[in-house]
């Protein structure tokens, strides 16, 4: 397939001012280890035969990444390839040849879902980051967030997604699923991910979020009682778990007397703060606020891809911070 630019594309690429989208895509172009990612998918990707020749695997992977960065449906991604030159160039496509349609884009996503390849990409990228010395093992921060799912029954099946559930947080009811993550305390990179229905208690998945080499685990008050859990009895770590809000309020009524205890809570909170970074990236930077698909498997595939890309985005942030300070 030709990567030659059309007249319109070349005119676009020679513009002086770079847009925010161009700058972002340029950074992602450099930080993503494309060959490592392609090697994960290649054994499952259709080979050129007698029928219609498939698009290059890396092109489809680049399109898939852009779908997650910009929270685009298959149809919206197809439109973007026609309308936005910077996205077309990033995918190594040109208007002088056919562009992938929404069905082709959807089929690539289904391929990743069918073989759980987003999970494999998550592991591959984390191994690559660990080998690069970015991901450490000393401490793990754990947290969970509720992700809303459409609660309407006005669909083909006339029912809500049976794999999603309702749960109450504070005074509000939520319907959907929950993403549980284990995060490297040093870098803020996500090393573990578990997807469940929203009504799953955070503590139930704690053991699945630990890699086994950490010396301490930090968590909010929702994880109180973790050291007493039978399945965590063999876990030899320092537990830095926040006290319940009511107890903290009581301590603050006598600040002088409880100064040490209050300072310990502040210390726990400062250590724990980095666990919010991955959620902030996927929600605010990538715009992911609601489950797009039906069923936990498809949504787990999307979340695994989102956290893979969030780790690479975070690694890029760390590199740029280092460059500014040197």
Curated annotation (Swiss-Prot):
Assigned keywords, A-Z: DNA recombination, DNA-binding, Transposable element, Transposition
Name of this chain's protein: Transposase InsH for insertion sequence element IS5H
InterPro entries linked: Transpos_IS5, Transposase_11, Transposase_InsH_N
GO molecular function, one term: DNA binding
Statement: the UniProt record of this protein carries the keyword DNA-binding: yes
One CC-aspect GO term: cytosol
Gene Ontology biological process terms in this record: DNA transposition
Function per UniProt: Involved in the transposition of the insertion sequence IS5.
Pfam families linked: DDE_Tnp_1 (PF01609), DUF772 (PF05598)
Similarity-based family: Belongs to the transposase 11 family.
